[in-house]
Amino acid sequence: QHLADYDEVEDDRAKLHLDAR
């Protein structure tokens, strides 16, 4: 479960990075 949460956070960060572009 913890790994899943971490994956979700990473996904959000990636999304933010793409949006920031």
Swiss-Prot record:
Coiled coil: none annotated. One of its GO terms (biological process) is adaptive immune response. It is found in: Secreted. Keywords: Adaptive immunity, Blood coagulation, Coiled coil, Disulfide bond, Hemostasis, Immunity, Innate immunity, Pyrrolidone carboxylic acid, Secreted, Sulfation. Conversion of fibrinogen to fibrin is triggered by thrombin, which cleaves fibrinopeptides A and B from alpha and beta chains, and thus exposes the N-terminal polymerization sites responsible for the formation of the soft clot. Heterohexamer; disulfide linked. Contains 2 sets of 3 non-identical chains (alpha, beta and gamma). The 2 heterotrimers are in head to head conformation with the N-termini in a small central domain. Cleaved by the protease thrombin to yield monomers which, together with fibrinogen alpha (FGA) and fibrinogen gamma (FGG), polymerize to form an insoluble fibrin matrix. Fibrin has a major function in hemostasis as one of the primary components of blood clots. In addition, functions during the early stages of wound repair to stabilize the lesion and guide cell migration during re-epithelialization. Was originally thought to be essential for platelet aggregation, based on in vitro studies using anticoagulated blood. This is Fibrinogen beta chain. The lineage of its organism: Eukaryota, Metazoa, Chordata, Craniata, Vertebrata.
